[in-house]
Amino acid sequence: MKDDKILRIYTDGGCSGNQSEENLGGWGAILEYGSAVKELHGAEENTTNNRMEMTALLEAFRAIKKGGQNIHVFSDSSYLMNCFREKWYVKWQTNGWKTAGKKPVENRDLWEALLPFLEEHEISFFRVKGHVNLNSKLTDFEKLYEKFCEWNGRQFSYEEFEYITEKNNRADELANIGIDEIRQP
């Protein structure tokens, strides 16, 4: 099911009160290489969901001990996936970090921190559906499996899809742990 030569990263970020002035955001990441697993989490005040999604990936990248890795990233963030898979960042850099609408790119600091890792490693990005109930009716889960394969343009085994979904849910739990920890005095 898993390729022991591929470093898999599962990430999630979330924000309670997203876009409000007094919100809390959390992020979670899981790094998996063969049988070795490392879980990371953290939180910030006055942030956004997108920043937490990006922070999860950045902290996962920072935890990698050596360069030249073959990495598969699994995330439910359309923002992250679209940027990397459609190479938005290339257009942004060419346009002086402006969007197609001539506005400054949001979260530029995090994008600039993430981009060097693309040069250092061979990275593939896979979009997953977030917050999946693993006890869903079989037909609903099968539809999610078909959508997952369609989104990613390749076939995964059903068992692999279940495993990836479990890991994505765990990354979400880690993000919530981060939020809970920052709430405590």
Give residue ranges: language-model regions.
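RNase H catalytic domain
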Residues: 14-19, 58-168
